[in-house]
Every structure is written in structure tokens, then in C-alpha cells.
């Protein structure tokens, strides 16, 4: 008790220092208290009562500096998460704490099996996994004074271990696409764990592709899941479609953009999707594909013999192999609509874009004559 109490002095000093140095922008920085206190590896004995006391004392110390600071927790993972979230919210209610937001972590991997330096396991059913988040949201909203406060997923990924090779695969990319289509339903934000593979929680990795958490392998080599996020970033506009297989939007300029995926554990093989857009005229269809043979540096590294260290030339090659396959074609409207059909390989992600073709060719220019040699 004395240790926690005395640490409040340092918390207040730190916040005042940050305010002095960076100004009131600091007030927009959410303050999350601790990390996974429901695990004994991060909080001694996973002692819930001690964590709740820490949370209350920290919240009060922060608010004493400036009541505009936003404070939240409990930053739990999926272990006994229902019990922890219920008890956390009850504690905040009973003590009339001015809780600003709620946080938790989200992983979707069965208990892994260790084999040498690596861990392997099955990805859970996405919809079943997402129910965990709805349960947390419902618990929060069952307290009238906290109903509707933001819920942030401050960590999410498939496996919760940084030695799970699934992280490096196109299967991971397709699975994460499936999650991204729904994670915004009950959460204010969701943060993928992590950006890069420079991570030493279990020691220094043995190989360039070792199942690290990151979107990017060491050496700035994008993994397939990097492109899932890059593709979703392009989806800004009016939502036209959101399903288990695709998301599409109409942009302000009239173009259409979307992401489609094929999660093999749900489809069992390749799949085909057809999108119909009511319109007239000629359109350009652009696709960027991530699958087993495109934007998959893991396969190239494997085919090269899985070298444990990379020369500069190999690193360059793997970066080059990490780019999606880009294709374009022209589509003409028939009967008042344009139809785009995508064939998706198992465990693939495809970005697609439909843009109206406008303008005329320069005088005398013929693409057909150029490519046919006439």
C-alpha cells in the first residue's frame, strides 16, 4: 500500500512535466492503467483487488493534475475476461469513479503447441471470437453512468505469442481482413500488436521469419497482413457493402473501392465474387492481389532454403517479392451496370477499384496498333 501511494507523487510529477513540455495537447492522450493484470506474468498473482486499488489511486492522482485527462482500464486479455470486466465495472460504480473509457486485448488463437523455437495452433472461428467483445460492451453498458463510453482494443492479433509462424502468412492476412470488417461495431479503436518484428519478449529471434507479431519483418520487409491494413486504409467514403467476404465504399469522386478476401478455413478452397455497379460508360478495374504467390516474402524465403540471416541482396529481393500483383482492365456497362468478377485463391486478400474512364486519346495514338505492331 505504501508503494502504490508513494508512486502517485511520481505520476503527478510526470504529467505536470509533460504538460509543461508539450502543452495541452497532452490532455488528448488517453491514459491506460497497467497491462493485462489478469495474468500473473504481468501483475503479481493476478491479484484483482490489488489492481482495482491501483486503478482507483492512479485515476485520482491523474485527475488531481487536470480533470480533463482521460483515464481507463482494465487492459485485460481473454483470461477470465468476463469476470474481470464485470468486477472492474462494479468497482468503478461502487466507488463513483469518473471512468472515461474501457480497454481490453483481443487474440483469436487456441492454446498453442510448442515445437522447438516456435508455436502452432488453430485460428478460432472469427464470429465466435468477436462475441467476446460484444460481451464486454454489454457489461459496460449495463451500468447507466458508463453506458456508451468508448471501448478501445489496445492490442489485437491472431496468436498472442511472438513465435507463431501464422503471423507471417497470407492466412493471417485474410483472417485479419475478416476481423477488420467488424471490429468497429462495438469498439472506438483497435490497435494491431505490433507494427514491426523488433520485439524481444521471448528473446532474440533465430530467423528473419520467426512468427513475430509485426506487420513488417526486420529489414523493412512487409508481410502479407501489412497489405490488409494498407488496403483498408483506402476505404474512405459511403459504405456500399460489408459482408463476411468483402467491404466496398463509394468515394466522393464517384469511384468505388473495396477489399475482398478468401479465408480458407471458411471456404475450403478458391472462391469467386461478382460485384455489380449500376452505371453507364467505361470503367477501369484495378486489382492488387496478396496470395500464396504474390506479396508473400515468406514463401520466397522458404524456397531459398530459409536462410537464418540475410545479405543485403537477399533483403532487397524479399522486399521486391513483398509487393502485391497489380492488374488493370477496362469494363463497359451493359444494360445499365458494370460487373466485376474476382477469383480469389484460398487465403488471399484483393484490393479492387472501379474508376470511370474519361478523356480522349491524343491525336493519332492507338494502343491497339502499338501492342499489335500494326
Enumerate the predicted regions with their spans.
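Acidic (Asp/Glu)-rich catalytic clusters
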Residues: 16-26, 91-98
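Acidic, Ser/Thr/Pro-rich beta/coil linker or hinge segments at domain junctions
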Residues: 279-340, 363
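Carbohydrate-binding surface patches
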Residues: 243-303, 343-355, 361
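Aromatic/acidic polysaccharide-binding cleft in carbohydrate-active enzymes
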Residues: 152-271
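Single conserved hydrophobic/aromatic residue that forms the stacking wall/gate
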Residues: 1-5, 10
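Terminal connector regions
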Residues: 357-374
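Short, conserved phosphate-binding/catalytic loop or strand-edge motifs used
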Residues: 29-36, 154
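Noncatalytic carbohydrate-binding groove/subsite architecture in carbohydrate-active enzymes
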Residues: 48-182, 186-188, 207
